[in-house]
Amino acid sequence: TPDYSQGAAFVRGRYVPIGEAAIPITDWGFLRSDATYDVVTVWDGAFFRLDAHLERFLASCARFRLDPGLSPAQITAVLEQCVRLSGLRESYVEMIVTRGQPPWGSRDPRLAVN
């Protein structure tokens, strides 16, 4: 079984140990800093003001025309599962959405798949 004791990540639809989380080198989030993020604190096993963080994160996604690919309820469920898998009671949880990878040779960000 995977070791999530250092943290868990949700990448491309699956949970992985934080040390195995990766994005392709051709992802525009990596190449061009075309991404957005927000960080929420977990204290004593509970998120601190998750609704406010999620609202701000989704507003940033909309402003930069980034599709998180999940509904707010689904994002919440993913974050909760990451904390549950890790067993960490005190932590920071980062929500990140990148532009993704465009088709090879394309410069059109609308064609990128994240």
Language-model features: locations:
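Conserved alpha/beta cores of soluble small-molecule-handling proteins
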Residues: T1-N114
